[in-house]
Regions:
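Auxiliary tRNA-acceptor-end handling modules of aminoacyl-tRNA synthetases
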Residues: 1-199, 208, 216-217, 221, ...
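Extended catalytic-interface subdomain
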Residues: 272-291, 305, 350, 355, ...
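The catalytic-center signature of Zn2+-dependent metalloproteases
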Residues: 231-252, 257, 344-400
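Conserved catalytic/binding loops enriched for acidic/polar residues
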Residues: 337, 341, 367-732
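Sec-exported extracytoplasmic/periplasmic mature domains
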Residues: 212-223, 253, 355-356, 360, ...
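Generic secondary-structure boundary/loop-capping signal
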Residues: 170, 245, 258, 263, ...
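Conserved structured catalytic cores and adjacent interaction surfaces
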Residues: 227
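Stable alpha-helical elements in mature extracytoplasmic
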Residues: 203-210, 342, 346, 350, ...
Length: 732
């Protein structure tokens, strides 16, 4: 299966089509000799294609200056050990499975013991699929930026008057009505999913319910029973390699690179989806937590970076455990409640991954469907969904107390999902002008909140990425800051009784430590959600003249940005933000296994990494520049005010008293970051306003640090050190 990443279209009636290959570099990935030829058919040797990286590159180059100074390297391809594992011919596809062996005789990074037996030899098994392209009456549908589908990009090189000459085709299945004249009809051939016999029996009903729930959306597009589900018999005479079977598969890996993944195979000429499989990881529904790294994963450097893959279920395990911890601590945690958490999460995961295989991309705006008051009311959320699209990455929805426990996850396609399926799958009208008008009427609804859309290119998961705080991962409700504050208050209320609830006679403190970690990860995630409103810009992709449209860019109102800084000051930067008991700290012990690493909890590192994750955002060059830029079109929360508020949050509360060790870390970290801005070296390039205001705030810090009367020796030493590093930096 060879995908054409970019395609250029030339109208054959246009003389320019005669020069369609001019200034276009075509890649020659491999070559092979013709062994035999008969009646126009060729026999070639394929080893140069399939036993090398010609068709699929596995090794990656080393990036100089990267954060990881000693990255894991798989080595060079060992051609003498690389081999074919299997060759399977099916009626509509041929699969070649190749085991690539890489050799690194002297590795400096031995990797992880999770699935890697010896770093000197790494095996990668890759399946190459050759798929027969169909010949049918499938009609492509072209993308619109207001609704999110995966696409095959096509640029019209002969369109003279169109500023956006795009003919990008959305990816969709070929569905036909049995009775085309009826508004709603049974389908000729449904999209049939097979639940593989590897699926644990106790999970099959939830998976089935999640798949079949999509029929609700297809009915709005005119199709009845468009999606079907079957169970693979144990004695089935077919396997998942046959493209005629769309299979939901399960695995239980030691350290999976994904937890739920829904790839599909597409005809690059039309956008028709030819087949799909979904791989789900059982580890997402277990209590296995990587506690050896729980105190290292709060900064934005460790946020999910691969926007092209689906990592939804990676976080679902943590979300499920948080829901169980919270329910056990603030409500009546019964076996029925535990079942509901697992059931709803698995239905939601199935909906999400099936959505990808239907062609839908992520929609990280979708969590804004309900108000903060309604989000915990099952009677409101169950009929239409907890969020407007199951294609979002959300956290488990946990209420503030046992009386306000709504849905944990969504169990039905939301309003956006139904609208998107209606756009992509409703059969075209015979008259092109009528069809264009029909689509415009449907797309004109995009200004409504329930149809809001923002994908991976728009989201703010990483520091400095994106601009619209509504397009964020793991947030909830149309008041994300209010929900994040509520989440942090819930976590704070759980901590005092956490040890007594999670210690069991005869057991180690491993589960308690895991619970402590998960609560803090959720706490840090809430802080990052809040931080995105500072310097944020609300974005609207409505078309000119569309009813209900707003300006394309609207700065987040001043009062919202100020409130975000207030919340961060209280919940993240203040002296009592992490006021845990000594008893809790002294019991953070994981169960011994082997002898690697020190076992004492690195508490200061945990807290500082959480604070770093927010400072990464607030002091990112993109954010500081954007605050200055948005002052030109409506932002009244100036860069000067923001940086002054940040300095105040880090220094003012203990200006005349002793400074705790956690605040010493924070103040030193913040000071060093301002120094870095002033020096303005390396890859990050700050504008002059950011440099000047950083310089000004360093002088303010010197004034804070000059107060050394009536404080202990540690505080005196800390403040003298701040003055020293500031003077040294400004003198160079």
């Amino acid at each position: 299966y060879i995908r054409f990443i970019k395609i250029m279209y030339f109208d054959k009636e246009n003389p320019l089509s005669r020069s369609s290959s001019t200034n276009v570099s075509t890649a020659i990935l491999g070559s092979s000799q013709i062994v035999a030829e008969k009646n126009g058919e060729l026999l070639i040797g394929v080893d140069n294609l399939f036993l090398t990286e010609a068709l699929h590159q596995i090794t990656r180059g080393f990036v100089p200056g990267g954060m990881n100074k000693n990255p894991f390297r798989i080595g060079k391809l060992a051609k003498d050990r690389t081999k074919y594992v299997s060759l399977n011919n099916y009626p509509e596809n041929t699969d070649l499975v190749v085991q690539y062996v890489y050799s690194n005789p002297v590795p400096t990074n031995w990797g992880s013991d999770k699935g890697l037996t010896d770093a000197r030899s790494v095996n990668a098994v890759v399946q190459h699929s050759l798929i027969q392209m169909p010949e049918n009456n499938f009609k492509p549908r072209y993308e619109d930026p207001r609704v999110g589908y995966f696409t095959t990009q096509v640029t019209d090189m002969t369109a003279a008057d169109d500023p956006t000459p795009y003919r990008d085709m959305i990816h969709k299945w070929h569905l036909e009505k049995k009775n085309p004249s009826q508004e709603r009809s049974e389908v000729v051939e449904p999209i049939t999913w097979w639940i593989e016999n590897t699926t644990p029996n106790e999970l099959r009903d939830a998976v089935r319910d999640g798949v079949l729930a999509w029929n609700k959306a297809f009915e709005e597009a005119g199709f009845i029973n468009a999606v079907d589900v079957k169970i693979q018999p144990d004695d089935a005479d077919w396997d998942a390699g046959d493209i005629r079977y769309n299979v939901l598969r399960w695995a239980s890996s030691p350290s999976p690179p994904f937890s739920g993944y829904g790839p599909s195979f597409v005809n690059p000429r039309t956008g028709q989806i030819l087949g799909a499989d979904i791989m789900l990881e059982y580890s997402s529904f277990t209590y296995r937590v990587k506690t050896e790294k729980i105190f290292e994963t709060f900064s934005s450097d460790n946020m999910v970076r691969d926007e092209k893959s689906c990592q939804f279920s990676h976080v679902m395990q943590e979300n499920n455990m948080f829901a169980m911890i919270a329910s056990r601590s603030i409500g009546d945690f019964s076996p029925l409640e535990q079942h509901r958490i697992i059931y709803e999460s698995l239905v939601d995961l199935s909906l999400h991954e099936i959505g990808h295989t239907l062609g839908l991309s992520h929609n990280f705006y979708a969590s804004h469907l309900h108000t903060l008051n309604n989000i915990h009311d099952r009677h409101i959320t169950e009929p239409i969904g907890l969020y407007s699209s199951v294609m979002d990455y959300t956290s488990a929805n946990v209420g503030p107390d046992s009386k306000h426990h709504g849905q944990f996850y969504s169990t039905t396609p939301g309003p956006y999902d139904i609208w998107a399926i209606e756009y992509g799958y409703t059969p075209s009208l015979d008259n092109p002008e009528d069809e264009k008008e029909r689509q415009e009427v449907l797309l004109s609804k995009s200004t409504k909140n329930e149809y809001g859309y923002g994908n991976d290119a728009d989201d703010m998961r990483r520091a400095g990425k994106g601009i619209d705080p509504r397009v964020m991962l793991y947030d909830m409700s149309n008041d994300p800051m209010g929900y994040a504050q509520q989440r942090m208050d819930i976590i704070k209320s759980i901590f005092p009784s956490l040890l007594t609830r999670f210690e069991a006679p005869g057991e180690s403190y491993h589960f308690f430590r895991s619970a402590f970690s998960i609560l803090n990860r959720q706490y840090g995630s809430s802080a990052r959600i809040i931080s995105r409103f500072v310097g944020g810009v609300y974005m609207d992709r409505s078309m000119v003249g569309q009813k209900g449209k707003e300006d394309p860019f609207i700065p987040v109102p001043r009062e919202e940005q100020k409130w975000a800084m207030t919340l961060l000051g209280k919940y993240l930067f203040s002296a009592d933000a992490f006021d845990f008991s000594e008893e809790m700290y002294s019991h953070l012990q994981w169960q011994r296994r082997g002898w690697s690493g020190t076992k004492d909890p690195k508490i200061h590192d945990m807290v500082l990494n959480m604070q770093k994750g927010v400072l990464d955002q607030l002091l990112h060059q993109n954010v500081l520049k954007r605050i200055s830029d948005t002052e030109l079109y409506g932002n009244t929360y100036t860069l000067s005010q923001m940086m002054n508020d940040l300095t105040t949050a880090c220094f003012s509360s203990d200006a005349g008293s002793n400074v705790t060790t956690m605040r010493i870390n924070l103040q030193t970290e913040y000071t060093r970051r301002l120094i870095s801005v002033v020096h303005n070296k390396g890859k990050s390039k700050y504008d002059h306003a950011s440099v000047a205001l950083s310089y000004e705030n360093l002088n303010k810090i010197k004034k804070y640090a000059s107060k050394v009367k009536s404080v202990n020796e540690a505080t005196k030493a800390h403040r003298k050190h701040l003055i020293y590093i500031i003077d040294k930096a400004l003198d160079t």
